[in-house]
Amino acid sequence: MKPSVILYKALPDDLLQRLQAHFTVHQVANLSPQTVVQNAAIFAEAEGLLGSNENVDAALLEKMPKLRATSTISVGYDNFDVDALTARKILLMHTPTVLTETVADTLMALVLSTARRVVEVAERVKAGEWTASIGPDWYGTDVHHKTLGIVGMGRIGMALAQRVHFGFNMPILYNARRHHKEAEERFNARYCDLDTLLQESDFVCLILPLTDETHHLFGAEQFAKMKSSAIFINAGRGPVVDENALIAALQKGEIHAAGLDVFEQEPLSVDSPLLSMANVVAVPHIGSATHETRYGMAACAVDNLIDALQGKVEKNCVNPHVAD
């Protein structure tokens, strides 16, 4: 008999068939308590779990005594109780490599659109305000040769560094838990403490996961240290930033503009002051949202679950020591 797995995110037909070739697949709409109660027998027998954008916590795991592996269609896993999974020797798989280039593209788009005011001036054109040759009130700022600070020099940070170094001749500062020799050799990136990065960068790009240590890492103190001409970019996780402090910094002119793909609460409230600011580019967590990349992430997650339930955890596993 094939192992039983629960799928809580729709998959393309070919990927669903790949999953079904290895497992008995039960599809549910979500992981809400109501769904779990209504499908109690299925959850009780499931050895695998695959999907995204749902919380997997200790309460859910109590209902899944046979669970051996869970696979998320994402690189981030802050919605998983990793300690609870590890305590129960349940593997957690994710998709860290598939989306690197696409998210770096999104970061670059935010850098360019904020500096050159692309969204703002496009809306002015649509509103019929372009009635003569444009003047300084339409101008943006240059990107090339400006200093870019990267907070979090992982795969995505490296991909962004490659773009700005070779494409825009930008000096790069970075702050991370450790020195990144490859970034320094390939892109002439300079490691520095966070305060120095904030004080010297024209663009500050935040690419950090959400952990207890990074929650509200950026607040009023950090924004106050940035140049008043600086542009802040966040495409990591929303709660790494104290959003109220960001709003205040923008309102007071402590920073020039912001390009945001992530927020403390998602979807962003329609009442958020960020939405009324012309110098803010706010997009709905589109970092990896292309047809090609989302398919690749789903395919990776399927393969990850197959590997995990076959005892193969050489890659893409958050807690591989569970398999020891």
Curated annotation (Swiss-Prot):
Family: Belongs to the D-isomer specific 2-hydroxyacid dehydrogenase family. GhrB subfamily.
Active site location: R237, E266, H285 (proton donor)
Gene3D superfamilies with a match to the protein in the record: NAD(P)-binding Rossmann-like Domain (3.40.50.720)
Alphabetical list of PROSITE patterns matching this protein: D_2_HYDROXYACID_DH_2, D_2_HYDROXYACID_DH_3
Entry function: Catalyzes the NADPH-dependent reduction of glyoxylate and hydroxypyruvate into glycolate and glycerate, respectively.
Assigned EC number: 1.1.1.79, 1.1.1.81
Subcellular location(s) per record: Cytoplasm
Record's protein name: Glyoxylate/hydroxypyruvate reductase B
Keyword annotations from UniProtKB, A to Z: Cytoplasm, NAD, NADP, Oxidoreductase
Subunit annotation: Homodimer.
Cellular component annotations (GO), alphabetically ordered: cytosol; plasma membrane
Pfam families listed in its UniProt record: 2-Hacid_dh, 2-Hacid_dh_C
Catalytic reaction equation(s): glycolate + NADP(+) = glyoxylate + NADPH + H(+); (R)-glycerate + NAD(+) = 3-hydroxypyruvate + NADH + H(+); (R)-glycerate + NADP(+) = 3-hydroxypyruvate + NADPH + H(+)
Any one GO molecular-function label of the UniProt entry: hydroxypyruvate reductase (NADPH) activity
